[in-house]
Design a protein with these regions (language model features):
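Haloarchaeal acidic low-complexity proteome signature biased toward cell-envelope/secretome components but also
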Residues: 1-41, 497-525
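Flexible hinge motifs at transmembrane-helix junctions and intramembrane kinks/re-entrant loops
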Residues: 2-8, 72, 194-199, 209-298, ...
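Membrane-embedded helical hairpins/re-entrant loop segments and their flanking transmembrane helices
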Residues: 34, 39-41, 65-102, 288-362
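Early transmembrane hairpin of solute transport permeases
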Residues: 41-208, 377-381, 387, 391, ...
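Hydrophobic alpha-helical bundle architecture
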Residues: 68, 97-101, 333-337, 347-438, ...
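Transmembrane helix-bundle signature of multi-pass membrane transporters/permeases
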Residues: 83-86, 90, 108, 142-146, ...
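Lipid-exposed faces of alpha-helical membrane segments in multi-pass integral membrane proteins
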Residues: 88-91, 95, 144, 148-151, ...
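C-terminal ends of transmembrane helices
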Residues: 91-103, 148-162, 211-221, 304-312, ...
Length: 525
């Protein structure tokens, strides 16, 4: 394990103030948190940070757009939805790195809120609602859940819960974010079976390219190590373009690429607040979305520890965690107002990039945020992303969701896996987080579930109330909510030492509470 570099000035690599004596998981820190590389280099490094998470930034709006039927009913708005994600990501990242926890961590759309969003969309689709109504309901649910997150963060509640959120809880929650999305339509869409020669192989090409560049060619050139997802998407997309132009793919094929939409896209797209209409507030949808927000808070809790470890500094204090969660709540609030249909949270992909490149500079991430903000308003870019065929998006999902599941399970390195207690809790949480949502999906929808609840003996009249049954349905359909609740309950009631649960391992590397100064404290000093 290498020592953190502490030599160098503004343009040289150094460790951040208060850095730990050792770098937790990285072999080096090329640029510390407080370092400012030259502007030209910072722009390239900042854009690189965003390229590492562009797959997720693109995957989420495309998943939402597909579920809402936007590709068929409003293909022109798909590009605007993608652009909105980039704008929100840029603003949220600037806010977090400047006045939040001040870690070099990118903020953007979160998979933890995708599952409840898809459940909400499914419930509304059964009622015949259009995509704008769906987005308005998603906006309301996100805004309401975000307000609660802001309160939890800035009142210090998240820091106070630190001793209750061990890796035993965090691991299954993050893992289920990826595992619970294995059957999204872009992967399991039955139309693939009807055109297997034109679609399954394109999906396989996408996955195979990502595997090739990330696992086999990563040692041959840095570009393969840094951008395997992006290169894999580009390779598969170029193949689809060639087949579309040559006529092998017809406009009716799911592999067809329509470049005409890119040429007709406005140069500057109108990404504005409340662009889909006024938010609608439904309690059941809020409850389901808050389960996703809660999962994102737990995920960010683990991400803060990871980014500190890879940046060569001490683990976050309760104070830093509180300010980070509070700012993520404000980011979610902004995302709800802008109408992404999703929220904003810390990106594990960005943290992994720090470990690979050793670039942990806050300044670099801020430069990249400005680049992403500008790109979000550039219409042709968003529309170009929207041309990705469904099989390519499905291949991207397989790679991304699998990576997220693995990141979650990696938190178990801190716990005693020889303990039958820990193995039981993690196993039960993971299984329930997959089984219960599968059961909910087989009930026939929220309406059929309500009828079933109403027929329950004795308490049926209570469970059959629409707001109650809808809340149970949405929460029960969200894997990370189910698994997280079970893990939290068992981990804090079944006997186990703090060392056994992995809490001591985190406490041993935590920074002092006085080491972090909030934005307002810095302004007053």
């Amino acid at each position: 394990m290498s020592d953190v570099r502490t030599d160098g000035g503004e343009d040289g690599p150094s460790g951040a103030p208060g850095a730990a004596a050792e770098v937790g998981e990285s072999d080096f820190v090329e640029y510390g948190i407080e370092d400012k590389p030259p502007l030209g280099e910072s722009i390239l490094l900042g854009f690189q940070h965003y390229l590492t998470m562009i797959g997720a930034t693109v995957a989420i709006p495309l998943a939402l757009a597909g579920a809402m039927g936007m590709f068929e009913t409003a293909p022109g708005d798909v590009g605007r939805l993608v652009g909105t994600f980039f704008v929100v990501s840029g603003i949220a990242t600037l806010a977090q790195t400047t006045i939040g926890n001040r870690y070099p961590i990118v903020q953007g759309g979160t998979f933890s809120m995708l599952a409840p969003a898809l459940a909400i969309i499914g419930a509304l689709a059964a009622q015949g609602a259009g995509y704008q109504v769906m987005l308005q309901e998603l906006q309301g649910a996100i805004i309401a859940a975000a307000i609660v997150e802001v309160i939890v963060g800035y009142l210090g509640l998240m820091g106070a819960l630190k001793r209750f959120l061990s890796p035993v809880v965090i691991a299954p929650v993050i893992a289920l974010i990826g595992l619970a999305l294995f059957n999204v339509p872009q992967i399991t869409n039955p139309t693939f079976a009807e055109t297997s020669q034109q679609n399954w192989w394109l999906l396989g090409l996408t996955v195979g390219s990502i595997v090739l560049f990330s696992q086999y060619l990563d040692d041959y050139h840095r570009v393969f190590r840094l951008f395997p997802v992006l290169i894999g998407i580009v390779v598969a997309w170029l193949v689809a373009v060639i087949l579309s132009v040559s006529g092998f793919y017809t406009p009716q094929s799911v592999g067809y690429v329509d470049l005409a939409a890119v040429a007709s896209a406005p140069l500057i797209q109108p990404v504005v607040p409340l662009q889909w209409g006024m938010p609608q507030f439904t309690f059941a949808f809020f409850a389901g979305m808050f389960a996703g927000v809660l999962a994102s808070m737990i995920e960010s809790f683990g991400d803060y520890h990871a980014v500190a470890r890879l940046s060569g500094v001490s683990a976050p204090s309760k104070k830093r965690i509180n300010h980070g969660i509070g700012m993520e709540g404000l980011g979610n609030l902004f995302a709800g107002i802008m109408g992404t249909g999703n929220g904003s949270t810390s990106y594990s992909e960005n943290i992994g990039a720090i470990g690979i490149t050793g670039v942990a500079s806050r300044y670099v991430v801020q430069i990249g945020a400005v680049v992403m903000l500008i790109v979000g308003y550039f219409g042709p870019f968003g529309q170009l992303v929207a041309t990705l065929p469904t099989p390519i998006v499905g291949g991207l999902f397989i790679a991304m969701f699998g990576q997220i599941a693995a990141v979650g399970l990696s938190n178990l390195k801190y716990v005693d896996l020889d303990s039958s207690r820990n193995v039981f809790i993690v196993g039960l949480s993971l299984f329930a987080g997959l089984a219960i949502p599968a059961y909910m999906g087989a009930t026939g929808g929220a309406g059929a579930f309500q009828q079933g609840m109403a027929s329950v003996a004795i308490i049926g009249p209570i469970l059959g109330i629409k707001i109650i049954s809808d809340t149970i349905f949405v929460v029960g359909s969200t894997g990370m909510a189910v698994g997280g609740l079970i893990a939290f309950l068992l981990d804090n009631t079944v006997s186990g030492t703090t060392e056994e649960r992995g809490i001591d391992a985190w406490e041993d590397i935590a920074e002092d509470e006085d080491a972090f100064e909030s934005f307002f404290e810095r302004m007053g000093s």
